[in-house]
Amino acid sequence: MLTLTVLCASLGPAVFAQGPGSSSSAGGSSRGGTTGANASGTQSAVPVAQQQLYTSTGANGAQPTQDSFHGSIIEGKSTGSNLELSLDDAIQRGLRTNLGIILQTSAQKNANGQRLEQLQALLPTVTGSASIEVQQVNLAAFGLKFPGVKPIVGPFQVVDFRAYLTQNLVNVQSLENYIAAKHNFQSAKLTAEDARDMVVLTVGNAYLICIADASRIEAVHAELATSQLSFEQATASHDAGVSPRIDVLRAQVDLQNEQQNLISATNQLAKDKLALARTIGLPLDQPFTLSDTAPFAALEQMNPQQAFERALAARKDLAASAEQVKAARAGQTAAFADQLPVARVYGDFGDLGTTPGHSHGTYTATGEVTAPILQIARTRGEKDVADAQFETARARLSDQIQQVNQEVHDSLLDIEAAARLVQTTRSNVDLATEELSEAQQRFHAGISDNLPVSQAQAQTEQANNQYISALYQHNVAKLSLARALGIAQTNYKEYLGGK
């Protein structure tokens, strides 16, 4: 390190800048430097937030969200009375209590703290100290011997009250480190805003799952009533000697199968309601019912390229990744700036004497320029690290742009396919119901046994399951499109309503 120091002294008070140091008893100052460090940013993964829809016959292929968005902090206590929970209420609760938002908000505070830490390297630093020192010196120990003079001096005391100031005048590395930290903070802020879209998608999806479960229970109740009627008809026909006992057994098996389906569907709804409560911060012992339904509502077709361009402008996670690239670029400059000279001033001013009443003002003022002379390995190492971080951030941003493009296209394809599925499965429900009615009439008239009735009941159950699943998939696809476009928080009603 090559150091150029200019020492200034005068009798009057002076104000120079920066740097905590410790003074000697004679009023000298010690030099302090501030070295910036690269602030680390917060990376945010953006998965497709679709939970699994379980039915008694299987599960669709929906992908789960990050675990943090399935948790929350509890808001309030259970009232003991039933709560009517609308989709709007659920989303607003989620935006207040969801763990994903809370963690992202904490990450934003952390990034802001790192930004302020880096900012301090560019601002004046003032510290103060007060000391009292009592000494007794043996001059002979230092080889000082004078005839007629006692070698022991003291005891005497020194009182020192002093303030220290330090200021960087030119420090490019600290400046670039602050710029990087500022971009990291902006990235964390955008990521926290993006988390709100994720919460809307997660809570909305959990609510839609519960709606699908409730629809499944309603369908099973209808199927159970049909099975009960078929069992009674088979029993009456057998008692009248018209049909064999196998018809009664077949009808009884169908009836008990539906009873099992009802138990499973009811249990699944209870579990999915617990999952919804966990997502929005409701106490798990708080009873609630869903006050909204999700009927089919077609969404106006959208041009994929226009939708992608809209997503590029609105997605907060993309903007956050762009800030990460800027932060990494500033990190490259900071790594290079480690080779540059640093200019700073520092000094101190205070009262020095034997007692506060017998003291005098003293100060020092120093200007300093330091520059590295030989640190080849460190310089190259810092450059390689900064280059790698920049290349990584840039590659992730490029990939994320394509990921958003894919999410937009996937959502549009899912909406189109699910809309056709809803129409087809709705028709299947009508046809299966008509077939069941015909089979029941033929059995009641004694034209055939109840095997066609049993088969028609199974087909009706399958058609209802497929219709419920298709309706759920259509609504989730619309909600996913709103998320892919970066407008889930503000436009989810429009997309679920199909306007």
PLM segments and residue spans:
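Small/polar-residue-enriched beta-strand and adjacent coil segments characteristic
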Residues: L83-S86, T125-A195, P304-R310, A314, ...
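Short segments within alpha-helical structural elements
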Residues: Q120, N257-L282, A418, S427-I487
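Bacterial Sec-pathway N-terminal export signals of envelope proteins
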Residues: G19-S131, V137, L284, S291-V325, ...
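Acidic, low-complexity, intrinsically disordered peripheral segments
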Residues: M1-L53, Q136, Q466-K499
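Short, charged, amphipathic alpha-helical segments
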Residues: T105, K182, R245-D254, N450-A458
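Alpha-helical heptad-repeat coiled-coil segments that mediate oligomerization/polymerization in large
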Residues: P244, V404, S411, D449-N450
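Periplasmic alpha-helical coiled-coil/stalk elements that build and connect Gram-negative outer-membrane
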Residues: R196-R310, D414, A418, Q459-E461
